[in-house]
């Protein structure tokens, strides 16, 4: 079967759109009137209330604050969501703090609240509506598609892909925020987001556990030029309950990255395990990309597809973290079992204590680990060492750090600190530069 709509073209329910193992249920997209795609324009001049613009009525665009000399960023929500939800306009507001931009929140709640199998077909109409608006801007107002960036969450990521594909990949950038897995993973490129949909495609994966049995809603498949897997792509810190917490974190990371880009450096790495074992450190000579809003500043961004990056984030607030590699060489009287902790004292502030090692503590041995610190301490001036025993014993041995080496992930700078002190457990020892 096939259904056609005036300015949007025709839609079929033949393969690969339906009747495949990934898409067993055959259905056509709903009527565009029912889906009722709306474009809510926010700009630096109207940050708190939107102007409704319509592709079929160019007068609405000309009468609005849409500025032809600025970039345009579309934000597209996902399943069961709405374009008037606060997270979309909040993202625009963060952008207005760092740039002048046309920020268009795309509302398709008339199509997103259907059953999932139907909603996944409805995005084809929404993608066509977005593409049509970009075409109108291009043909009627001479506005170049490469100035367009489409950000989509969940089903919205594949909606962005559909729009980009219809514009022959001429859109400047697409960002996929945890693209939806069911009905899209392992499907042909024309059905889902893929790197050919824009000049640059970057993706943040936060919920890659399988849909069955874990209810992981996001794709594990790499679908961009650059695919970021914060915290390995699943089980986000601070997400205790609720099936949507991990899936929604991709939005929160992007939102924070607009104002805190340096706190989301992605390390190129083959796997999260390798990253966690202190591999893939420090950043390469050309630097690490910034996950989120400023990923497009990375020099090698489109050198290859499926470039893979890992990082760890915080559990709340702005989620930023700064990664360091720490090596502690111990001195002391005997080898109790316990843990050793280090804090960094820098020009911009002091970090909390981070555990470097837990186990048998042997004098003269060295222990190395990577830590993700909650603030950018700047140039490191001192470090503190603290050890704690596990278990109880009558004797009170003393241990110390004779040397602590700290390396910054961002630029590879190494700092060396020394001391000849030894301290009892729970007593802080300060080390100065050697």
Swiss-Prot record:
The active site is at 154 (nucleophile), 178 (charge relay system), 247 (charge relay system). The keyword Lipid metabolism applies. GO terms for biological process: galactolipid catabolic process; lipid metabolic process; phospholipid catabolic process; phospholipid metabolic process; triglyceride catabolic process. It catalyses: a triacylglycerol + H2O = a diacylglycerol + a fatty acid + H(+); a 1,2-diacyl-3-O-(beta-D-galactosyl)-sn-glycerol + 2 H2O = 3-beta-D-galactosyl-sn-glycerol + 2 a fatty acid + 2 H(+); 1,2,3-tri-(9Z-octadecenoyl)-glycerol + H2O = di-(9Z)-octadecenoylglycerol + (9Z)-octadecenoate + H(+); di-(9Z)-octadecenoylglycerol + H2O = (9Z-octadecenoyl)-glycerol + (9Z)-octadecenoate + H(+). Its EC number is 3.1.1.26, 3.1.1.3. Disulfide bonds join 4-10, 92-103, 239-245, 269-280, 283-288, 418-434. It is a peripheral membrane protein. Glycans are attached at residue 318. One of its GO terms (molecular function) is galactolipase activity. Ca(2+) binds at residues 189, 192, 194, 197. Signal peptide: none annotated. Residues 76-88, 240-244 are annotated as: Required for galactolipase activity. Pfam families: Lipase, PLAT. InterPro entries: AB_hydrolase_fold, Lipase, Lipase_LIPH, Lipase_N, Lipase_panc, PLAT/LH2_dom, PLAT/LH2_dom_sf, TAG_lipase. Belongs to the AB hydrolase superfamily. Lipase family. Lipase that primarily hydrolyzes triglycerides and galactosylglycerides. In neonates, may play a major role in pancreatic digestion of dietary fats such as milk fat globules enriched in long-chain triglycerides. Hydrolyzes short-, medium- and long-chain fatty acyls in triglycerides without apparent positional specificity. Can completely deacylate triacylglycerols. When the liver matures and bile salt synthesis increases, likely functions mainly as a galactolipase and monoacylglycerol lipase. PANTHER family: LIPASE, PANCREATIC LIPASE-RELATED PROTEIN 2. This is Pancreatic lipase-related protein 2. It comes from Cavia porcellus (Guinea pig). The lineage of its organism: Eukaryota, Metazoa, Chordata, Craniata, Vertebrata.
